[in-house]
Design a protein with these regions (language model features):
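Short, surface-exposed amphipathic charged segments that create phosphate/polyanion-binding patches used
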Residues: 74-77, 139
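Membrane-interface extramembranous regions at the lipid-water interface
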Residues: 1-25, 40-75, 103-134, 153-182
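Hydrophobic, aromatic-rich membrane-embedded alpha-helical segments
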Residues: 24-44, 81-100, 135-154
């Protein structure tokens, strides 16, 4: 998402690292607390998207409301507790549910984007089972210490390919090593 000096048709971001880290930590804490997560996540999406700029200088905005998806966010947060239960395979068994919730959030997010106040006719067309596969692969890849970065780079490419409703092709060009050195 960060525009390089040689790229002309990329999204650019004006988000500073300090506020981004602080807001990300706040989302993580509220994910743990469960109840505030719909409001904090929605606020984070609004804050971050407002700092994105399209190649022609248009400003993006996120218009989703917490009350649209509060139950999905809370259920997803509850699923996060599966790792604390002493059943090692429980997070993997919950993968179909967590993937379903994640897919609902992604579809909601994409459908609530605007550019310069105009609604964008975007939708996320990625199917459920591939999303489950990417979610499971992402979970398993964390055991490789560094392999997760390549998985998430490929996952982002898949997600971008599945955004429909624009004449412009959305492409993620990041690589695993670029993901890794930024974390």
């Amino acid at each position: 998402l960060i525009q390089s000096p040689t790229s002309q048709n990329c999204l650019a971001t004006t988000a500073n690292v300090g506020p981004l880290v602080g807001r990300t930590l706040l989302v993580a804490i509220c994910q743990f607390l469960i109840i505030p997560i719909p409001w904090v996540a929605t606020d984070f999406y609004k804050w971050f998207v407002e700092r994105l700029q399209l190649p022609r200088g248009e400003r993006l905005a996120f218009i989703g409301k917490p009350e649209d998806m509060w139950h999905v966010f809370m259920l997803a947060a509850l699923c996060g507790y599966a790792g604390f239960i002493p059943i090692p395979v429980l997070p993997l068994l919950l993968t179909p549910l967590t993937a379903c919730l994640g897919l609902l959030i992604v579809r909601w997010f994409v459908s609530n984007l605007t550019a310069d106040g105009r609604a964008l006719p975007l939708r996320f067309a990625g199917a459920y089972w591939p999303y489950v596969g990417w979610t499971a692969l992402g979970m398993v890849s964390f055991y490789t210490i560094v392999g997760w970065a390549w998985v998430y780079a490929a996952f982002m490419r898949w997600m971008c390919r599945n955004v429909e409703g624009t004449n412009t092709k959305i492409v993620f060009t990041g690589t695993g090593i670029e993901y890794l050195w930024r974390t």
